[in-house]
Protein backbone atom coordinates (compact mmCIF):
# COMPACT_ATOMS: atom_id res chain seq x y z
CA UNK A 1 0.00 0.00 0.00
CA UNK A 2 1.29 3.44 -0.86
CA UNK A 3 0.42 6.67 -2.63
CA UNK A 4 0.02 7.50 -6.30
CA UNK A 5 0.62 10.91 -7.85
CA UNK A 6 -2.38 13.20 -7.61
CA UNK A 7 -4.46 10.93 -5.35
CA UNK A 8 -4.58 11.86 -1.66
CA UNK A 9 -5.46 8.35 -0.49
CA UNK A 10 -3.69 5.09 0.33
CA UNK A 11 -3.59 3.07 -2.87
CA UNK A 12 -2.90 -0.56 -3.78
CA UNK A 13 -2.81 -2.28 -7.16
CA UNK A 14 -4.08 -5.88 -6.95
CA UNK A 15 -4.46 -7.36 -10.42
CA UNK A 16 -7.75 -9.19 -10.96
CA UNK A 17 -7.83 -12.65 -12.51
CA UNK A 18 -7.50 -12.25 -16.29
CA UNK A 19 -10.85 -14.01 -16.79
CA UNK A 20 -12.63 -11.19 -14.97
CA UNK A 21 -11.78 -8.35 -17.37
CA UNK A 22 -11.45 -7.75 -21.09
CA UNK A 23 -9.32 -6.36 -23.87
CA UNK A 24 -6.90 -3.48 -23.85
CA UNK A 25 -8.13 -0.04 -24.95
CA UNK A 26 -6.93 3.46 -25.71
CA UNK A 27 -7.52 5.53 -22.57
CA UNK A 28 -8.33 8.51 -24.81
CA UNK A 29 -11.67 6.81 -25.39
CA UNK A 30 -12.66 6.92 -21.70
CA UNK A 31 -15.73 9.18 -21.50
CA UNK A 32 -17.57 8.10 -18.34
CA UNK A 33 -16.97 7.21 -14.72
CA UNK A 34 -19.60 4.85 -13.32
CA UNK A 35 -20.07 4.53 -9.56
CA UNK A 36 -21.36 1.33 -7.96
CA UNK A 37 -21.88 -0.20 -4.54
CA UNK A 38 -20.59 -3.66 -3.66
CA UNK A 39 -23.77 -4.80 -1.92
CA UNK A 40 -21.77 -6.51 0.83
CA UNK A 41 -21.81 -5.99 4.57
CA UNK A 42 -18.67 -4.51 6.06
CA UNK A 43 -16.38 -5.36 3.15
CA UNK A 44 -13.10 -3.61 2.34
CA UNK A 45 -11.25 -2.53 -0.77
CA UNK A 46 -8.46 -4.99 0.10
CA UNK A 47 -10.91 -7.86 0.49
CA UNK A 48 -12.51 -7.11 -2.86
CA UNK A 49 -9.11 -6.88 -4.51
CA UNK A 50 -8.18 -10.31 -3.18
CA UNK A 51 -11.54 -11.78 -4.17
CA UNK A 52 -11.33 -10.72 -7.81
CA UNK A 53 -7.69 -11.80 -7.98
CA UNK A 54 -8.32 -15.29 -6.60
CA UNK A 55 -11.69 -16.16 -8.18
CA UNK A 56 -13.12 -16.41 -11.69
CA UNK A 57 -16.47 -14.58 -11.62
CA UNK A 58 -16.64 -12.87 -15.02
CA UNK A 59 -17.18 -9.40 -13.54
CA UNK A 60 -14.91 -6.67 -12.21
CA UNK A 61 -14.41 -2.97 -11.59
CA UNK A 62 -11.35 -0.81 -11.94
CA UNK A 63 -11.38 0.57 -8.38
CA UNK A 64 -12.73 -0.41 -4.97
CA UNK A 65 -13.00 2.23 -2.24
CA UNK A 66 -13.64 1.93 1.50
CA UNK A 67 -13.24 4.04 4.66
CA UNK A 68 -9.48 4.49 4.46
CA UNK A 69 -8.04 3.38 1.11
CA UNK A 70 -8.63 2.20 -2.43
CA UNK A 71 -7.55 -0.83 -4.45
CA UNK A 72 -7.24 -0.91 -8.21
CA UNK A 73 -8.07 -4.32 -9.67
CA UNK A 74 -8.09 -3.60 -13.41
CA UNK A 75 -5.77 -1.21 -15.25
CA UNK A 76 -7.44 1.84 -16.77
CA UNK A 77 -6.13 0.64 -20.14
CA UNK A 78 -8.22 -2.54 -19.90
CA UNK A 79 -11.99 -3.02 -20.14
CA UNK A 80 -13.59 -4.00 -16.83
CA UNK A 81 -16.92 -5.85 -16.79
CA UNK A 82 -18.85 -3.50 -14.52
CA UNK A 83 -21.86 -1.92 -16.26
CA UNK A 84 -23.48 -4.38 -18.64
CA UNK A 85 -27.27 -4.51 -18.76
CA UNK A 86 -27.88 -8.14 -17.77
CA UNK A 87 -31.02 -8.12 -19.90
CA UNK A 88 -31.94 -4.49 -19.23
CA UNK A 89 -31.90 -1.77 -21.87
CA UNK A 90 -29.19 0.84 -22.13
CA UNK A 91 -30.32 4.35 -21.16
CA UNK A 92 -27.26 6.16 -22.53
CA UNK A 93 -24.14 5.56 -24.62
CA UNK A 94 -21.99 4.55 -21.65
CA UNK A 95 -20.46 1.08 -22.04
CA UNK A 96 -17.73 -0.97 -20.41
CA UNK A 97 -15.42 -0.01 -23.26
CA UNK A 98 -15.65 3.76 -22.69
CA UNK A 99 -15.95 3.95 -18.91
CA UNK A 100 -14.17 3.37 -15.62
CA UNK A 101 -15.97 1.56 -12.82
CA UNK A 102 -15.60 2.64 -9.18
CA UNK A 103 -17.11 0.39 -6.50
CA UNK A 104 -17.88 1.67 -3.00
CA UNK A 105 -17.83 -0.75 -0.09
CA UNK A 106 -20.97 -0.89 2.03
CA UNK A 107 -22.40 -1.85 5.38
CA UNK A 108 -25.82 -3.23 6.20
CA UNK A 109 -27.95 -2.05 9.12
CA UNK A 110 -31.34 -3.64 9.81
CA UNK A 111 -31.44 -5.04 6.30
CA UNK A 112 -30.61 -1.72 4.62
CA UNK A 113 -27.37 -0.90 2.80
CA UNK A 114 -25.42 2.26 3.57
CA UNK A 115 -22.31 3.91 2.19
CA UNK A 116 -20.35 5.50 5.03
CA UNK A 117 -19.39 9.15 4.97
CA UNK A 118 -15.68 8.27 4.93
CA UNK A 119 -16.17 5.93 1.97
CA UNK A 120 -18.11 8.64 0.17
CA UNK A 121 -15.33 11.17 0.79
CA UNK A 122 -12.72 8.75 -0.51
CA UNK A 123 -14.84 7.97 -3.55
CA UNK A 124 -14.97 11.71 -4.25
CA UNK A 125 -11.16 11.78 -4.14
CA UNK A 126 -10.84 8.86 -6.56
CA UNK A 127 -13.46 10.16 -8.97
CA UNK A 128 -12.08 13.72 -8.99
CA UNK A 129 -8.60 12.32 -9.62
CA UNK A 130 -9.92 10.32 -12.58
CA UNK A 131 -11.90 13.31 -13.86
CA UNK A 132 -8.72 15.38 -13.94
CA UNK A 133 -6.66 12.56 -15.43
CA UNK A 134 -9.03 11.91 -18.34
CA UNK A 135 -10.71 15.31 -18.65
CA UNK A 136 -14.13 13.94 -17.73
CA UNK A 137 -16.80 16.49 -16.70
CA UNK A 138 -19.04 15.94 -13.68
CA UNK A 139 -21.97 15.42 -16.07
CA UNK A 140 -20.29 12.20 -17.24
CA UNK A 141 -19.99 10.79 -13.73
CA UNK A 142 -23.03 8.55 -13.44
CA UNK A 143 -24.51 5.67 -11.47
CA UNK A 144 -24.89 2.14 -12.78
CA UNK A 145 -28.58 2.96 -12.49
CA UNK A 146 -28.17 5.71 -15.09
CA UNK A 147 -26.63 3.25 -17.54
CA UNK A 148 -29.34 0.61 -17.58
CA UNK A 149 -31.71 1.04 -14.65
CA UNK A 150 -30.02 -1.38 -12.29
CA UNK A 151 -30.55 -0.37 -8.65
CA UNK A 152 -26.90 0.46 -8.10
CA UNK A 153 -25.65 2.05 -5.99
CA UNK A 154 -28.90 1.18 -4.24
CA UNK A 155 -28.55 3.70 -1.38
CA UNK A 156 -28.21 6.49 -3.94
CA UNK A 157 -31.13 5.30 -6.00
CA UNK A 158 -33.29 4.99 -2.90
CA UNK A 159 -32.27 8.47 -1.71
CA UNK A 160 -31.61 10.84 -4.61
CA UNK A 161 -30.33 13.51 -2.20
CA UNK A 162 -27.34 11.30 -1.40
CA UNK A 163 -26.48 11.14 -5.08
CA UNK A 164 -26.99 14.87 -5.54
CA UNK A 165 -24.71 15.55 -2.58
CA UNK A 166 -22.00 13.36 -4.09
CA UNK A 167 -22.25 15.12 -7.45
CA UNK A 168 -22.07 18.55 -5.81
CA UNK A 169 -18.83 17.58 -4.08
CA UNK A 170 -17.23 16.74 -7.40
CA UNK A 171 -17.45 20.33 -8.62
CA UNK A 172 -17.15 22.17 -5.31
CA UNK A 173 -13.40 22.76 -5.39
CA UNK A 174 -13.44 23.77 -9.04
CA UNK A 175 -16.12 26.38 -8.33
CA UNK A 176 -14.24 27.72 -5.30
CA UNK A 177 -11.05 27.95 -7.34
CA UNK A 178 -12.89 29.77 -10.10
CA UNK A 179 -14.28 32.32 -7.63
CA UNK A 180 -10.84 32.81 -6.11
CA UNK A 181 -9.26 33.35 -9.52
CA UNK A 182 -11.98 35.85 -10.42
CA UNK A 183 -11.37 37.74 -7.19
CA UNK A 184 -7.63 37.83 -7.84
CA UNK A 185 -8.29 39.24 -11.30
CA UNK A 186 -10.42 42.14 -9.99
CA UNK A 187 -8.79 42.82 -6.62
CA UNK A 188 -5.15 43.69 -5.87
CA UNK A 189 -3.79 44.44 -2.39
CA UNK A 190 -0.55 46.42 -2.08
CA UNK A 191 1.25 48.23 0.70
CA UNK A 192 0.81 52.00 0.66
CA UNK A 193 1.05 55.12 2.79
CA UNK A 194 -1.57 57.52 4.09
CA UNK A 195 -1.08 60.87 5.82
CA UNK A 196 -3.65 61.62 8.52
CA UNK A 197 -3.40 64.83 10.60
CA UNK A 198 0.15 65.29 9.37
CA UNK A 199 1.26 61.81 10.41
CA UNK A 200 2.24 59.08 7.96
CA UNK A 201 0.85 55.55 8.32
CA UNK A 202 1.43 52.33 6.46
CA UNK A 203 -1.79 50.94 5.00
CA UNK A 204 -3.12 48.07 2.92
CA UNK A 205 -4.18 49.65 -0.37
CA UNK A 206 -6.84 47.74 -2.27
CA UNK A 207 -7.24 48.33 -5.98
CA UNK A 208 -10.57 46.91 -7.12
CA UNK A 209 -12.43 47.62 -10.34
CA UNK A 210 -10.28 50.70 -10.91
CA UNK A 211 -10.96 52.22 -7.47
CA UNK A 212 -8.71 52.58 -4.41
CA UNK A 213 -9.86 51.39 -0.97
CA UNK A 214 -8.33 51.18 2.49
CA UNK A 215 -9.09 48.34 4.89
CA UNK A 216 -11.11 49.52 7.88
CA UNK A 217 -8.69 47.73 10.17
CA UNK A 218 -5.97 50.18 9.13
CA UNK A 219 -7.88 53.05 10.75
CA UNK A 220 -8.11 51.06 13.96
CA UNK A 221 -4.34 50.66 13.91
CA UNK A 222 -4.07 54.44 13.59
CA UNK A 223 -5.92 54.81 16.88
CA UNK A 224 -9.36 55.65 15.53
CA UNK A 225 -12.54 54.01 16.82
CA UNK A 226 -13.92 51.76 14.09
CA UNK A 227 -17.41 50.27 14.07
CA UNK A 228 -18.72 47.47 11.84
What are these regions (language model features)?
Residues 1-15, 22-27, 97, 105-184:
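Basic/polar, cationic surfaces and motifs that engage anionic cell-wall
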Residues 1-95:
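N-terminal catalytic cores of peptidoglycan-degrading enzymes
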Residues 37-41, 74, 130-134, 174, ...:
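Sec/Tat-exported extracytoplasmic proteins
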Residues 39, 67, 77, 106, ...:
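A mature extracytoplasmic/lumenal domain signature
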Residues 67-68, 138, 209:
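Residue-level signal for tight coil/turn positions that link beta-strands
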Residues 72-73, 149, 202, 214:
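A sequence-level detector of short linear motifs
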Residues 175-228:
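Primary recognition of N-terminal secretory signal peptides and signal-anchoring hydrophobic helices
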